[in-house]
Protein backbone atom coordinates (compact mmCIF):
# COMPACT_ATOMS: atom_id res chain seq x y z
CA UNK A 1 0.00 0.00 0.00
CA UNK A 2 2.84 2.39 0.80
CA UNK A 3 4.47 1.50 -2.51
CA UNK A 4 1.25 2.37 -4.38
CA UNK A 5 1.00 5.65 -2.51
CA UNK A 6 4.63 6.46 -3.34
CA UNK A 7 3.94 5.78 -7.05
CA UNK A 8 0.78 7.88 -6.92
CA UNK A 9 2.41 10.85 -5.21
CA UNK A 10 5.52 10.78 -7.40
CA UNK A 11 3.56 11.18 -10.63
CA UNK A 12 4.32 14.41 -12.41
CA UNK A 13 0.75 15.68 -12.32
CA UNK A 14 0.44 15.22 -8.56
CA UNK A 15 3.68 17.10 -7.93
CA UNK A 16 2.55 19.91 -10.25
CA UNK A 17 -0.72 20.12 -8.35
CA UNK A 18 1.06 20.26 -4.99
CA UNK A 19 3.36 23.04 -6.18
CA UNK A 20 0.38 24.91 -7.61
CA UNK A 21 -1.54 24.72 -4.33
CA UNK A 22 1.45 25.95 -2.32
CA UNK A 23 2.13 28.83 -4.71
CA UNK A 24 -1.58 29.63 -4.79
CA UNK A 25 -1.71 29.88 -1.00
CA UNK A 26 1.31 32.18 -0.96
CA UNK A 27 -0.15 34.26 -3.78
CA UNK A 28 -3.43 34.61 -1.86
CA UNK A 29 -1.53 36.08 1.08
CA UNK A 30 0.17 38.57 -1.25
CA UNK A 31 -3.13 39.61 -2.84
CA UNK A 32 -4.80 39.96 0.56
CA UNK A 33 -1.99 42.25 1.68
CA UNK A 34 -2.16 44.23 -1.56
CA UNK A 35 -5.88 44.82 -1.12
CA UNK A 36 -5.78 45.47 2.62
CA UNK A 37 -2.62 47.57 2.78
CA UNK A 38 -2.55 49.41 -0.56
CA UNK A 39 -5.83 49.38 -2.47
CA UNK A 40 -8.24 49.85 0.44
CA UNK A 41 -6.42 52.92 1.81
CA UNK A 42 -6.35 54.38 -1.69
CA UNK A 43 -10.10 53.85 -2.10
CA UNK A 44 -10.60 55.05 1.46
CA UNK A 45 -9.02 58.39 0.56
CA UNK A 46 -11.79 59.01 -1.96
CA UNK A 47 -14.72 57.93 0.19
CA UNK A 48 -13.42 59.40 3.45
CA UNK A 49 -12.87 56.15 5.35
CA UNK A 50 -9.50 54.45 5.51
CA UNK A 51 -10.60 50.93 6.48
CA UNK A 52 -13.14 49.53 4.04
CA UNK A 53 -13.58 46.29 5.96
CA UNK A 54 -15.50 48.15 8.67
CA UNK A 55 -18.06 49.62 6.28
CA UNK A 56 -21.58 48.58 7.24
CA UNK A 57 -25.14 49.75 7.44
CA UNK A 58 -27.96 48.79 9.74
CA UNK A 59 -31.61 48.22 8.95
CA UNK A 60 -33.59 47.56 12.07
CA UNK A 61 -31.65 44.97 13.98
CA UNK A 62 -29.81 43.59 10.93
CA UNK A 63 -26.27 44.77 10.24
CA UNK A 64 -24.91 44.44 6.72
CA UNK A 65 -21.10 44.39 6.65
CA UNK A 66 -20.52 45.20 3.00
CA UNK A 67 -16.93 46.34 3.54
CA UNK A 68 -15.67 42.79 3.99
CA UNK A 69 -17.62 41.80 0.90
CA UNK A 70 -15.94 44.60 -1.07
CA UNK A 71 -12.55 43.32 0.07
CA UNK A 72 -13.44 39.81 -1.10
CA UNK A 73 -14.63 41.13 -4.48
CA UNK A 74 -11.43 43.12 -4.97
CA UNK A 75 -9.34 40.05 -4.01
CA UNK A 76 -11.27 37.90 -6.47
CA UNK A 77 -10.90 40.39 -9.31
CA UNK A 78 -7.15 40.71 -8.79
CA UNK A 79 -6.64 36.94 -8.61
CA UNK A 80 -8.84 36.38 -11.68
CA UNK A 81 -6.88 39.02 -13.61
CA UNK A 82 -3.53 37.49 -12.69
CA UNK A 83 -4.73 33.98 -13.58
CA UNK A 84 -6.03 35.31 -16.91
CA UNK A 85 -2.64 36.85 -17.74
CA UNK A 86 -0.78 33.70 -16.65
CA UNK A 87 -2.95 31.54 -18.90
CA UNK A 88 -2.40 33.93 -21.81
CA UNK A 89 1.36 33.79 -21.18
CA UNK A 90 1.43 29.99 -20.97
CA UNK A 91 -0.66 29.69 -24.14
CA UNK A 92 1.82 31.92 -26.00
CA UNK A 93 4.77 29.86 -24.78
CA UNK A 94 3.22 26.50 -25.70
CA UNK A 95 3.96 25.31 -29.22
CA UNK A 96 1.02 25.56 -31.55
CA UNK A 97 -0.52 22.23 -32.39
CA UNK A 98 -0.53 21.45 -36.04
CA UNK A 99 -4.01 20.84 -37.27
CA UNK A 100 -4.27 17.40 -38.70
CA UNK A 101 -5.92 17.44 -42.06
CA UNK A 102 -8.84 15.11 -42.39
CA UNK A 103 -8.21 12.05 -44.45
CA UNK A 104 -10.12 12.68 -47.67
CA UNK A 105 -10.72 8.95 -48.13
CA UNK A 106 -14.11 8.10 -46.60
CA UNK A 107 -14.41 5.07 -44.37
CA UNK A 108 -16.69 2.16 -45.22
CA UNK A 109 -19.15 3.41 -42.62
CA UNK A 110 -19.27 6.83 -44.27
CA UNK A 111 -19.80 5.23 -47.68
CA UNK A 112 -22.71 3.15 -46.37
CA UNK A 113 -24.24 6.19 -44.70
CA UNK A 114 -23.98 8.15 -47.93
CA UNK A 115 -25.69 5.34 -49.83
CA UNK A 116 -28.49 5.22 -47.26
CA UNK A 117 -28.87 9.00 -47.46
CA UNK A 118 -29.02 8.91 -51.25
CA UNK A 119 -31.59 6.09 -51.21
CA UNK A 120 -33.75 7.99 -48.74
CA UNK A 121 -33.55 11.14 -50.85
CA UNK A 122 -34.59 9.21 -53.96
CA UNK A 123 -37.47 7.60 -52.07
CA UNK A 124 -38.85 10.95 -50.89
CA UNK A 125 -38.81 12.47 -54.40
From Swiss-Prot:
Subunit-structure text: Homopentamer.
Keyword match Membrane: yes
Gene3D superfamilies, per the entry: Large-conductance mechanosensitive channel, MscL, domain 1
Record family assignment: Belongs to the MscL family.
Function comment: Channel that opens in response to stretch forces in the membrane lipid bilayer. May participate in the regulation of osmotic pressure changes within the cell.
Assigned keywords, A-Z: Cell membrane, Ion channel, Ion transport, Membrane, Transmembrane, Transmembrane helix, Transport
Localization of this protein: Cell membrane
One GO cellular component term: plasma membrane
Gene name, Swiss-Prot/TrEMBL: mscL
Membrane topology: Multi-pass membrane protein
GO molecular function: mechanosensitive monoatomic ion channel activity
Name the UniProt record assigns to this protein: Large-conductance mechanosensitive channel
PANTHER family tied to this protein: LARGE-CONDUCTANCE MECHANOSENSITIVE CHANNEL, MECHANOSENSITIVE CHANNEL MSCL
InterPro entries: Mechanosensitive_channel_CS (IPR019823), MS_channel (IPR001185), MSC/AndL (IPR037673), MscL_channel (IPR036019)
Membrane-spanning ranges: 15-35, 67-87
Amino acid sequence: MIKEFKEFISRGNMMDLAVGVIIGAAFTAIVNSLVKDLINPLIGLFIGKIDLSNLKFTVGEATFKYGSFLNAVINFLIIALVVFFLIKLVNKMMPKKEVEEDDPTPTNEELYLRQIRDLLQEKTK
